[in-house]
A protein has these predicted regions:
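Acidic, PIN/NYN-like endoribonuclease modules and their adjacent C-terminal/linker elements
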Residues: 1, 107-143
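Short, well-structured N-terminal submotif of metal-dependent ribonuclease cores
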Residues: 1-38, 53-67, 131
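Alpha-helix/helix-capping structural signal
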Residues: 7-8, 41, 85, 108, ...
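Hydrophobic helix-cap positions at the C-terminus of alpha-helices
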Residues: 29-30, 72, 93
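Aromatic- and histidine-enriched alpha-helix N-cap/loop-to-helix transition segments
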Residues: 38-44, 104
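Short, hinge-like loop/turn segments at secondary-structure boundaries
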Residues: 53-57, 99, 139-141
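Active-site neighborhoods of divalent-metal-dependent phosphate/nucleic-acid chemistry enzymes
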Residues: 77-124
Length: 143
């Protein structure tokens, strides 16, 4: 099973992004596949980014951002993942010296996806996920 990172969904939604067409094309290529899972945590992060004026020159309204997230949630071919009993592990990693505070989102996302059987992960930030347990982590924007 495979999943994809928030950054690809953000590029796909952002027409001003140099990676817009490629990200959108990648996500559209997954639309009918039955081996794709998306996580509610990723969608929460997407909602936050869609409304962020530092990312979008014209951020989406609350209703527009929810509509984008709902479109992902409503794909009947994909498995929708909510949460998993991973937080003891996540907190243990987060307590270690040198743990970057924003990394907690990536670690929780990875652990949740792995718990639900995801083995492949597409992201524009391969380095951030390379050692989190997936069999394959790749950047579809460079392949």
């Amino acid at each position: 099973m495979l999943s994809f990172d928030t950054n690809l969904a953000v590029h796909a939604a952002n027409r001003d992004s140099a990676s817009h067409a490629q990200s959108r094309g990648f996500i559209e290529s997954l639309a009918a596949r039955r081996d794709v899972a998306i996580c509610e945590l990723m969608l929460v992060e997407l909602y936050l980014k869609l409304r962020n004026e530092r990312i979008f020159t014209r951020p989406l309204t609350a209703a527009q951002a929810v509509a984008v997230c709902t479109a992902y949630r409503s794909n009947q071919a994909w498995q929708l993942i909510d949460c998993a009993p991973v937080m003891d592990d996540v907190w243990g990693l987060a307590a270690k010296s040198g743990f970057a505070f924003r990394r907690i989102i990536d670690v929780r996302l990875a652990r949740t996806l792995l718990h639900h059987g995801v083995t492949e992960f597409a992201t524009a930030n391969v380095r951030d996920f390379a050692k989190l347990g997936f069999e394959r982590v790749w950047n579809p924007l460079t392949t």
